[in-house]
Amino acid sequence: MTTEELEAAARAWIAAWNSHDLEAILAHYADGIVFQTPTAVARWGRADGVLRGKDELRRHFARGLELCPTLHFELEQIFTGPDGYAVLYRRENESRVIDTVELDGNGQAVRGRALYAGKQA
């Protein structure tokens, strides 16, 4: 993917989250996604914070949207690389987050990680 395509994918990801449309969010992820986030530790007691597969991600993201009906991401910066991107954004609770995303040949996330500075939802 070109830098422009990666930046467009990152902006579309932010827009999907801000729409609160779970299916639009999940459309950015491959079925075999491996996603690591501190919120999986808090919500599901997973010491490694790893969620595997779209079904686990669906459950996790649905719970996140329930817990935070005012969720909003304000994009601060996009970083791109050969096979993915990272986004730095500010949440509605003022915490800053970096999400890193590794993409497959179809432009869907196969590996991701969320890193928080401040409050986690």
Please report, for each region that a protein language model flagged, where it lies by residue.
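Hydrophobic pocket/interface hotspot
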Residues: 13, 25, 33, 53, ...
